Amino acid sequence: MFPIHKTQNLLFVGLFILTACSATDQSVATVTITAPPLPDLTELKILPTPMSPRQTVVHRNFQVTMSQAELTNGYQTEFDSTREPAADTQFLWIHIVLKNSGQQEQDLPEPEHFSVLNGRTEYKPTYGHRKDHVDYMALTTIMVKGQEVDAWLRFDIPAALGLSDLQFAFLPESSQVSLAFSPSAYPWGDHPIYLWTCAP
């Protein structure tokens, strides 16, 4: 005879096996949970219609005019040396005029607040030191009341592009054009942008 506790254990194991076998015969309902689609927070920024060269914008007592654009395949520096672009590139020169129309002195916008656009591609300025042309990066950083300055910005762009492919941008409150942004999560993406066509 088996002791009682061994009999109980044997019955328990048998019951467990019987339950497991009968459970495999039952069909299991599959539950599919579909997560709701996440809201698309990203919007495509619509850029303003570009102005023609020589038109002026006013932003917080600054008058900014893009006077003209010019493409060159080389230039003479103010040190009387000749500079040529890297392979497959050319120099784009943007002539701008700024005036402090406010009642107090103001900081000159940093060069990073200017860009040239070709579609979604953005180019930033670099030093030029072109002979007989005032370099924007060499200007003093403070403009007194009523002061006006005119200077040139240099951009290195692909040689295949023409003036009609390009737009000049003034970004007074940001350093790059943000084409895709979430206005609620990224309010900086909605900073003002002023555009000019580079072609006359």
Go through each PLM region and give its residues:
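Bacterial N-terminal signal peptides that target proteins for export
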Residues: 2-11
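Bacterial N-terminal signal peptides
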Residues: 11-19
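Conserved functional micro-motifs across diverse proteins
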Residues: 21-200
